[in-house]
Structure formats: structure tokens, C-alpha cells
From Swiss-Prot:
HAMAP family named in the record: Cas2
GO biological process: defense response to virus; maintenance of CRISPR repeat elements
Chain's gene name: cas2-1
Job of this protein: CRISPR (clustered regularly interspaced short palindromic repeat), is an adaptive immune system that provides protection against mobile genetic elements (viruses, transposable elements and conjugative plasmids). CRISPR clusters contain sequences complementary to antecedent mobile elements and target invading nucleic acids. CRISPR clusters are transcribed and processed into CRISPR RNA (crRNA). Functions as a ssRNA-specific endoribonuclease. Involved in the integration of spacer DNA into the CRISPR cassette.
NCBIfam families the record matches: cas2
Subunit structure: Homodimer, forms a heterotetramer with a Cas1 homodimer.
MF term (GO), any: RNA endonuclease activity
The keyword Kinase is assigned to this record: no
Enzyme class, first EC level, given as a word: hydrolase
SUPFAM superfamilies recorded: TTP0101/SSO1404-like (SSF143430)
Spans traversing the lipid bilayer: none
UniProt protein name: CRISPR-associated endoribonuclease Cas2 1
Similarity comment: family membership: Belongs to the CRISPR-associated endoribonuclease Cas2 protein family.
Listed cofactors: Mg(2+)
Amino acid sequence: MLYLIIYDVPATKAGNKRRTRLFDLLSGYGKWRQFSVFECFLSVKQFAKLQTAMEKLIKLDEDAVCIYVLDENTVQRTITYGTPQPEKPGSIII
């Protein structure tokens, strides 16, 4: 599944630290698309692990995180101008 994760964290000293930590966390799971937007192709297990980590990081009374779950049919119907359409990472064979 493709998870489109969009977040908004206040521009305060503490918020800036959380935003940086959230960016670093999401960078380990997916592709940074634009400011505060990540595309993450994840298994159910990976997504559960990411959710747990995000829930520990964000402040529910200050931050906003929206996660859109897109199945393969929806991803194939994505219209993209400019940069390439989201692609599922390929397998690495060693």
C-alpha cells in the first residue's frame, strides 16, 4: 500500500524539534515529496511500526498528521505533472 503522509507542526522552538524528528523518522520509511509530504510504500507491519513511532513523537493538541491510504488501483490512476508518478521501490537481489 502507498501511504501519503502529510503533517503540520507549529513553528515554535519545541515544534521545530518535533518537525525535524518527524522528518527524520519518515525519511527512513519513504520518499520526501515536498514540504511536509511523504510517500511511503509499506507493508502492514511496517505501517504499524511507523504509526507507533509517530504517536510517541507528535503532540495531539498541537500537531496535525493526515495519512491517506492508497491501494494499487488508486496509485495507478494518480495524475502527476512534472516529477514522476509514485513508484513502489524495487527488490534488491544480493
